[in-house]
Regions:
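Rossmann-fold cofactor-recognition segment
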Residues: 47-63
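Conserved glycine-rich Rossmann-like NAD(P)H-binding loop of the short-chain dehydrogenase/reductase
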Residues: 26-42
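Catalytic Tyr-X3-Lys loop
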Residues: 103-119, 139
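Amphipathic alpha-helical dimer-interface segment in Rossmann-like NAD(P)H-dependent oxidoreductases
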Residues: 74-78, 113-134
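Rossmann-fold scaffold of SDR-type NAD(P)-dependent oxidoreductases
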Residues: 9, 81-91, 114, 140
Length: 145
C-alpha cells in the first residue's frame, strides 16, 4: 500500500484539528506540529491504525521547527512514501482593533507564526525532499495575514 505523508501545523484545535481528523485514513502517515498535543487525536489515530506523531513546538520559533523538520525528513526513507504534503495552517490572530491601538508585540507574534514559520518550514521541506521522486505539495492557509 502506498503511504502518503502529511505534515500539518496547528493541528491541536480548530480547523487544523478538523483537517487532522480527516487525514486519519488508511494509507496516510500524519506528523502534526502544534503548541500542544491533542490526546483525542492520538486516540483516534490509534483506533484508525494510522501512524501519528505530534510534535509540541511553538511556531513563534520557526527556525527551530524548520531545523527539526529538515533533520527529520532527511532521516526518512523516501521509498516509504508515495507523496508528501506540508500544510502550513498554524496562525495567531492578534486582537482585532484599529492598527493605531495595536501592540507591536502582538503584530510581531502574528507575523512570526503566520509568515516566518511557514516560509522557514516550506524552505526546509522543499530542501530536504528535493531529490524525492514522488509528488510534493505545500499548502499555506492563513486566517488573518
Amino acid at each position: 500500500m502506498t503511504t502518503h505523508l502529511y505534515i500539518l501545523t496547528g493541528a491541536s484545535r480548530g480547523m487544523g484539528l478538523a483537517m487532522a481528523e480527516q487525514l486519519l485514513q488508511p494509507g496516510n502517515t500524519l506528523l502534526c506540529i502544534s503548541r500542544h498535543a491533542n490526546a483525542d487525536l492520538a486516540l483516534a489515530a490509534q483506533k484508525a491504525a494510522v501512524p501519528l506523531s505530534q510534535w509540541t513546538h511553538d511556531l513563534a520559533d520557526g527556525e527551530g521547527a524548520s531545523e527539526r523538520l529538515r533533520d527529520w525528513l532527511l532521516a526518512q526513507n523516501p521509498a516509504d512514501f508515495g507523496s508528501v504534503s506540508l500544510i502550513n495552517n498554524a496562525g495567531v490572530i492578534p486582537p482585532i482593533k484599529p492598527l493605531r491601538q495595536s501592540q507591536a508585540a502582538d503584530l510581531a507574534m502574528a507575523l512570526r507564526v503566520g509568515l516566518e514559520a511557514p516560509m522557514a518550514l516550506s524552505a526546509a521541506f522543499v530542501g530536504a525532499t528535493q531529490a524525492w521522486p514522488m509528488p510534493r505539495k505545500v499548502l499555506n492557509i492563513s486566517s488573518g495575514l
